């Protein structure tokens, strides 16, 4: 599962098992199975929406079973399904303040005719319009060079808050932690998502 249609790198497909091994001992985790969330190409269209719908259903079910749920693999084409599954679950009721905290170099608020790894959080924010729950979105690690002016404009219009990569590097760590804690304290339910491109190339070459 790669992110080429979102103008990203193809997933080598080897990371999931290694992350699982590093995350927790085998007796403390359970594999809920694989879901293909595939954008495809012009020559071989994938069923991105179908995969997202299946993944959202699985996530909602796991959360309703009070299971800490982690989605691994691919790019942020899985993020819309994750947000959708969360708000469909019993964890979110009328008036619930949902927060999405994204560690990422990109906003992923792209306006596009088709969903991709670059569109999920704009989709989620639009879904929240008129919904009974509230949704806030914050990003740590934004690269000013890798987000267009239009994306910054969209972020401002949507009430998104962010810390740039340079701010995160030059600020006191305590200050960044305080900023994150302030966001977390203002929501009832938190969805944390991490895109590895938030890491410097020297730390994560090839991302």
Model-derived features: positions:
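Conserved alpha-helical scaffold segments that buttress catalytic/binding sites
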Residues: 2, 6-207
């Amino acid at each position: 599962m790669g992110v080429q249609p979102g103008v990203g790198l193809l997933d080598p497909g080897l990371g999931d098992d290694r992350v699982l091994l590093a995350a927790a001992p085998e007796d403390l985790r359970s594999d809920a199975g694989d879901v293909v969330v595939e954008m495809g190409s012009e020559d071989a269209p994938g069923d991105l929406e179908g995969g997202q719908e299946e993944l959202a259903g699985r996530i909602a079910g796991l959360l309703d079973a009070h299971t800490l749920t982690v989605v691994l693999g691919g790019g942020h084409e899985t993020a819309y399904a994750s947000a959708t599954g969360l708000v469909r679950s019993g964890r979110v009721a009328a008036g619930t303040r949902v927060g999405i905290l994204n560690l990422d170099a990109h906003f992923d608020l792209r306006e596009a005719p088709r969903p991709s790894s670059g569109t999920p959080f704009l989709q989620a924010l639009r879904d929240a319009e008129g919904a009974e729950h509230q949704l806030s979105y914050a990003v740590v690690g934004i690269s000013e060079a890798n987000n267009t002016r239009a994306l910054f404009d969209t972020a401002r219009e949507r009430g998104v808050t962010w810390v740039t990569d340079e701010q995160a590097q030059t600020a006191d760590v305590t200050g960044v932690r305080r900023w994150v804690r302030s966001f977390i304290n203002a929501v009832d339910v938190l969805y944390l998502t991490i895109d590895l491109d938030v890491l410097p190339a020297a730390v994560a070459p090839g991302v």
